[in-house]
Structures are given as structure tokens and as C-alpha cells.
UniProtKB/Swiss-Prot annotation:
This is Serine hydroxymethyltransferase. Its cofactor is pyridoxal 5'-phosphate. Homodimer. It comes from the Bacteria. Belongs to the SHMT family. GO terms for molecular function: glycine hydroxymethyltransferase activity; pyridoxal phosphate binding. The keyword Cytoplasm applies. Disulfide bonds: none annotated. PROSITE patterns: SHMT (PS00096). It comes from Gloeobacter violaceus (strain ATCC 29082 / PCC 7421). Its EC number is 2.1.2.1.
Length: 426
């Protein structure tokens, strides 16, 4: 049942109106934010179900509330499907987000003041990997590695040097803005050399992993965390996976009662549906298309003279180094917004600009691949982006970009089952 149906419009037209506006925005824009996607109608139906009414602290068959027999069944389906997808021995599907999943892992494995080693945020890491503004950098001694200045690929010599010099308790791999394949085996070697736990945060690439178009970290890492949206195309939420049952029990306790109370069983139901979709053969095709489309976009941008961090992409995202066109990320993001393309400014390695300005623009292919666009269309998107970035003051270019974006959005409709929505003005 769509959230913006006639019942909601009649009951609360103010909220319904803003939801309708958002639906129109999603339909009329090219969504190129690498961390966003479009869930299926079935996922949204599960999340909007009566399971939202049920408290269920604990785990299936080990609850603190009565009346949990049916949510137990749903949560167990989600657990079993997650394990099957990733080849894990243990899965906890309760984390409300990827950040919550990481917080639970830290609680389970670390003591306050322990050392952790993760990628520098400005090189493509994540806030929860030891940023000083996040609890991971407040309660733990955070060390950071980066990418090689020339290749912009992970500097494993630096990772090894830092690991041996500081002996961290936990090493983190997995990123929010790294366009290349991650060598989990090399990280495992380094972790073993210094006796560290190894965490892979695959929030961005989880869908690629389960489809076999990116290496699986499960055989090499002590614990894997991810979000369930992004390339997995599920609801917003988190997930913890491990091949070690003993560690799995520690993670369960760290989630509840360690960092959360009652799980969101309606969201867990939506996770179960999304995992079921990802187990289908069609999902492998989708993930392969995500990678192919990203490469098509990267190749067209490069052909038009734009510079990409590391020279291209192996996964679903890329970073445009805007210094060659004398723009900042903040400026480029606004230029894209003016022609109905949704992106985000992003720091690049060794960025001279502040995180509020940046020198980069992050682009991703998952959402528009879900809408059905292929390599030809992503090549056209590359042309639109290049025209806008290289001719930012030309009104004719703006008009042409808007026309081409509108044509693509019309040809590849989003949520046609929701029908035509006319959002109110004002």
C-alpha cells in the first residue's frame, strides 16, 4: 500500500502533500547519489505492515514480550536469508543502521581507549571508522591510513607500517567513497601479523558482493557489517555477519541490550523481502549492470576530459576531481541540481578544500540502474554532466540538459503502480 494513498491524503493532507512532492522529485530527477536506491513495492509494503505495532526485545524464541511467535518467524526468515546470501554462519538483522551495526561491533570487541585502524575520512573512509567527531574517534584511539598519492589506491605499505607500529586491536576495511576492488586477503594478512580483529564495512558494495561481482569478505574477516539499502536495494537498516558463532553471540548481546532496545520488526520484515529478492537470479544481472553502467559513465566522463580519482571505477561509484574544470564540489552539486541531477559533493584524497566545500563530486549507478537505464543511457548521462560542468554559464546548455534529463526520466518510469500524483502547490 503506497504511503501517499487516498487514506493518508484524507487523514493528513499536509504530510501527504510533502510525500507526493518527494515522489515527484524522485520521478523527475536522475538519482546519482551512490548510497541511494529505489526499493521494490514489496519492500515498502512489508515496512508499512502491522508489524510496526509489535515490541520484540531479544532474539527469536528468546523474547521479553509475549505474542512474538509471528514476528519470530519473520525475523528468522531474514536471518536465514542473510546467511545464505553472504555465506555467513551467523547474522544479526536488528541494527537500525550501519552506524549502529559498527557501534555494536566496537562494544563487543573493544575496550575504551583501544586502538583502531581505518581509512582516513578524506580519502574515502567513513565517520564511524574513527572520525574525531564520531564516538568511534572519541572513545577509541583512532589511527588512519590512506591511498597512494599517485595511484589513489589503498597504500598497503602504509597500512602494514601503521599496524606494526601501533598494534591496533581492530583494523577496518570498507569505505564510503573508494571506487576500486578491496583486497580483503591482504588486509587479513596484516591483521594476522599484528593479532588484530578485522572488520569489513561493506555498506556500499554489499549488493555487488552477494551477486559475485566483488570479492566476498566473509572468508577473510572476523566480522562484516553493512547497511541493507544502497546496492542491496532494501529498507534503511543495518546487518552484522560473521563466520564465527562465538563472536556472533557477542555481537547479539552488543546489539541488545548493549546499544539498542526493541528491534524494528516491520523493517526486519522489509529486510527479509529484500534478501529474498537478492537471492533471485535477476539480482545477479542487476549487480552486473550496476558495475557496467558505472564504467560506461566513467569512460564517457574521461573521454570528455574530466579527471576521475584513481582513473576510473571497479564498482558502483566514481569521484570526479573538479580542479581540472576550476569548480568546487559545492558548486558542481548546485550545477547538477539546476538540471535535475542529484549528486553529492565529496572530498577527494589530499583535498585542498574543506569538507564543506570539497574538490570532488561523487556519482553512482545503483538507483538509475534499478530504473532500467543501461550503458547507452549512462553514456548519455556522462555527456549531460560534462556539458554542464564545462559550460556552467551557458543557458542553452542548461535547457538542453533539462530536456535530456526529462526524456530519460519519462522513458524509464519510477513506481508506475503509484499512478500519477499531482502535488499541491505551496
Amino acid at each position: 500500500m503506497p504511503v501517499s494513498d487516498d487514506l493518508l491524503r484524507a487523514t493528513d493532507p499536509l504530510v501527504a502533500g510533502w510525500i507526493d512532492r518527494e515522489l515527484n522529485r524522485q520521478r523527475s530527477h536522475l538519482e546519482l547519489i551512490a548510497s541511494e536506491n529505489f526499493t521494490s513495492a514489496a519492500v515498502m509494503a512489508a515496512q508499512g505492515s502491522v508489524l510496526t505495532n509489535k515490541y520484540a526485545e531479544g532474539l527469536p524464541s528468546k523474547r521479553y514480550y509475549g505474542g512474538c511467535e509471528f514476528v519470530d518467524a519473520v525475523e528468522q526468515i531474514a536471518i536465514d536469508r542473510a546467511k545464505a546470501l553472504f555465506g555467513a554462519a551467523h547474522a544479526n538483522v536488528q541494527p537500525h543502521s550501519g552506524a549502529q551495526a559498527n557501534a555494536a561491533v566496537f562494544l563487543a570487541l573493544l575496550e575504551r581507549g583501544d586502538k583502531i585502524l581505518g581509512m582516513d575520512l578524506s580519502h574515502g573512509g567513513h565517520l564511524t571508522h574513527g572520525s574525531p567527531v564520531n564516538q568511534s574517534g572519541i572513545y577509541f584511539e583512532a589511527l588512519h591510513y590512506g591511498v597512494d598519492p599517485a595511484s589513489h589506491r589503498i597504500d598497503f605499505d602504509q597500512v602494514r607500517e601503521l599496524a606494526h607500529a601501533h598494534r591496533p586491536k581492530l583494523i577496518i576495511c570498507g569505505y564510503s567513497a573508494y571506487p576500486r576492488v578491496i583486497d580483503f586477503e591482504c588486509f587479513r594478512e596484516i591483521a594476522d601479523e599484528v593479532g588484530a580483529y578485522l572488520l569489513a564495512d561493506i555498506a556500499h558494495i554489499a549488493g555487488l558482493v552477494v551477486a559475485g561481482v566483488h570479492p566476498n569478505p566473509i572468508p577473510h574477516c572476523d566480522v562484516v557489517t553493512t547497511t541493507t539499502h544502497k546496492t542491496l536495494r532494501g529498507p534503511r537498516g543495518g546487518l552484522i555477519l560473521t563466520r564465527d558463532e562465538a563472536l556472533g553471540k557477542r555481537f547479539d548481546k552488543a546489539v541488545f541490550p548493549g546499544t539498542q532496545g526493541g528491534p524494528l520488526e516491520h523493517v526486519i520484515a522489509a529486510k527479509a523481502v529484500a534478501f529474498g529478492e537478492a537471492l533471485q537470479p535477476e539480482f545477479k544481472t542487476y549487480a552486473a549492470d550496476v558495475v557496467a553502467n558505472a564504467r560506461a559513465l566513467a569512460e564517457r566522463l574521461t573521454a570528455r576530459g574530466l579527471t576521475l580519482v584513481s582513473g576510473g571505477t571497479d564498482n558502483h561509484l566514481m569521484l570526479v576531481d573538479l580542479r581540472s574544470v576550476d569548480l568546487t564540489g559545492k558548486q558542481a552539486d548546485l550545477l547538477m541540481s539546476d538540471v535535475n541531477i542529484t549528486t553529492n559533493k565529496n572530498t577527494i584524497p589530499f583535498d585542498p578544500q574543506s569538507p564543506f566545500v570539497t574538490s570532488g563530486l561523487r556519482l553512482g549507478s545503483p538507483a538509475m540502474t534499478t530504473r532500467g537505464l543501461g550503458t547507452t543511457e549512462f553514456g548519455e548521462i556522462g555527456e549531460i554532466i560534462a556539458n554542464r560542468l564545462t559550460q556552467p554559464t551557458d543557458a542553452r546548455v542548461v535547457a538542453d540538459c533539462l530536456e535530456r534529463v526529462a526524456s530519460l526520466c519519462t522513458r524509464f518510469a519510477l513506481y508506475p503502480h503509484l499512478g500519477r500524483v499531482v502535488a499541491p502547490v505551496g
